[in-house]
Structure formats: C-alpha cells, structure tokens
Design a protein with these regions (language model features):
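DNA-recognition helix of helix-turn-helix
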Residues: 66, 135-159
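Short hydrophobic short-linear motifs embedded
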Residues: 1-3, 8, 82, 162-168
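Acidic, proline/glycine-rich intrinsically disordered inter-domain spacer in sigma factors
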Residues: 4-7, 75, 79-108
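A short, charge-rich alpha-helical start-of-domain segment used by transcription regulators
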Residues: 1-22, 32-35, 46, 115
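Arg/Lys-rich amphipathic alpha helix in sigma70-family domain 2
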Residues: 63-84, 96, 155, 159
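Conserved RNAP core-binding helix
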Residues: 31-48, 139
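Sigma70-family region 2
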Residues: 2, 40-57, 75-76
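A short pre-motif secondary-structure segment
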Residues: 117-121
Length: 168
C-alpha cells in the first residue's frame, strides 16, 4: 500500500461495505447487529484474502456475511429461553423423544434461507447463479426458495386485505 492507503484487495473489499450494510440490516432487522456482522465480515475477508480465487468479490463477501449470520442464529438457538412458556398455549411438537426443537429449528432455518435468497435477488440484484454460490446450493434450490418466499409474501399481503367474495 502506498501512502498509508489500502492495498487493491482492501480497496475492493471496502467498496462492498454499503451493499453489505444494506443486506445485513435487511437480514437482521437490527442496526447494531448488522454493523457488527459487517465488521466481522470485513475482518474475515481481509484475513482470508488468500482463499479468494478471483471471480465476483461481492458474492464472496455475501457468502461470508451469510455464513456469519447463520452461525449467529445457531448460537442464539442454543441459548436457553429465559421467559417461561405456558405449556397449555403451545402445541406439543416434541412428542415422546423431544424432537420438536429440531423441527422448530428446521422450519426457522428454511424461512431464513428463503429470506436470504429473496434479499440477495431483490435488494442486492444478484443473479440466481450468484445466490446459488452464496448459499452453496443448486440453482434450482434458489428458484424454489424464491418461489416459496414470494408465495408467503403474497399470502401475507392477501391476508391483510379484506376478503371479497364474488356473488353470482
């Protein structure tokens, strides 16, 4: 680096900060958590420059951020719930083996993966191929996640409007 500036790789990484912030804030819905996530992403990227083998830097950065966020969510899921739950209000998903927790986590993860895909396509303008690389899944999986996410949004929005029935 000349004159105390960043090396070219660092400059390219720095240029992704606004997009990373936008994605992280949409993903976490919390400015402080998003800023921490972006900072951790930048540190990880700069330390892992040797692992970047060319290609689309922005997609690589989104991959790092997405993985860090998934790790954060897994860590939160392992923490005990501090507020008491009234067993009479909640359906018994656990069954005799107590596997309900796994079902809940699987459902939450699926929804998060759909949100990630939708945000990367709609908010960040990534192609389906780039989203597939970020999420480390086949492109068909991305297409399915997007279709389900869009259907859920449509269903939610339709539920917000008054229902009108046709009278014949």
């Amino acid at each position: 680096a000349t004159g105390g500036g960043l090396a070219p790789f660092g400059q390219e990484v720095e240029a992704t900060i606004p997009a990373l912030r936008r994605y992280a804030r949409a993903l976490t819905r919390d400015r402080d958590i998003a800023d921490d996530l972006v900072q951790d992403t930048l540190v990880r990227a700069l330390r892992s420059e040797h692992l970047f083998h060319g290609g689309e830097l922005r997609s690589w950065m989104y991959t790092i951020l997405t993985n860090l966020n998934r790790n954060r969510l897994r860590s939160l899921a392992r923490r005990p719930i501090l507020s008491p739950i009234d067993d009479n209000d909640a359906p018994d998903l656990a069954g005799p083996e107590g596997g309900g927790r796994d079902i809940s986590r699987a459902l939450a993860a699926r929804v998060d993966e759909q949100r990630e895909a939708l945000l990367l396509v709609v908010l960040e303008g990534l192609s389906y191929r780039e989203v597939a690389e970020v999420q480390a899944v086949p492109i068909g999986t991305v297409m399915s996640r997007l279709a389900r996410a869009r259907a859920q949004i449509k269903s939610y929005l339709d539920g917000e409007r008054p229902t009108l029935r046709r009278v014949k």
